[in-house]
Amino acid sequence: MALERTLSIIKPDATKRNLTGKINAVFEGAGLRIVAQKRIQLTEKQAGAFYAVHKERPFYGSLVSSMIAEPVVVQVLQGENAVAKNREVMGATNPADAAEGTVRKLFAESIEANSVHGSDSLENAKNEISFFFAETEILP
């Protein structure tokens, strides 16, 4: 098992309902340690750049719009196999398909308002973490 870091974003649909603490408790209960966290208001330019990989997809515009509607909480989670563990803890993208006890089953409103984002690979985690955090902002 490898100690890894992954990026998590608590999305606007969850922050507007004051669910940050409850979602953090699920992450921590699963053995993921929050080593950096900040609440920010994304600009359209930032959200567009972050989700640039989806630019040609039909949902891109609504995704960017939803991510700038309210503040988000960006965080770095650390733990054994953190990327896979976080994806397991988040649950399926569609909350209707998510397993019981996962963040999306517990808190998501819909496939569009699914409460959290998590890196899907170790390489993407490194890129996504550096998008939001300087190394000096992350606890060892």
From Swiss-Prot:
InterPro entries: NDK-like_dom (IPR034907), NDK-like_dom_sf (IPR036850), Nucleoside_diP_kinase (IPR001564), Nucleoside_diP_kinase_AS (IPR023005)
Keywords: ATP-binding, Cytoplasm, Kinase, Magnesium, Metal-binding, Nucleotide metabolism, Nucleotide-binding, Phosphoprotein, Transferase
Catalyzed reactions: a 2'-deoxyribonucleoside 5'-diphosphate + ATP = a 2'-deoxyribonucleoside 5'-triphosphate + ADP; a ribonucleoside 5'-diphosphate + ATP = a ribonucleoside 5'-triphosphate + ADP
Family matches, as Pfam families: NDK (PF00334)
Catalytic residue list: H117
GO cellular component term of the entry, any: cytoplasm
CDD domains: NDPk_I
Residues annotated for ATP binding in this entry: K11, F59, R87, T93, R104, N114
Broad enzyme group: transferase
Places the protein is found: Cytoplasm
Alphabetized GO MF terms: ATP binding; metal ion binding; nucleoside diphosphate kinase activity
Superkingdom as given in the UniProt entry: Bacteria
Enzyme Commission designation: 2.7.4.6
Cofactor(s) listed: Mg(2+)
GO-annotated biological processes: CTP biosynthetic process; GTP biosynthetic process; UTP biosynthetic process
PANTHER family xref list: NUCLEOSIDE DIPHOSPHATE KINASE, NUCLEOSIDE DIPHOSPHATE KINASE DDB_G0292928-RELATED
Assigned protein family: Belongs to the NDK family.
Function: Major role in the synthesis of nucleoside triphosphates other than ATP. The ATP gamma phosphate is transferred to the NDP beta phosphate via a ping-pong mechanism, using a phosphorylated active-site intermediate.
Subunit structure: Homotetramer.
Record-given protein name: Nucleoside diphosphate kinase
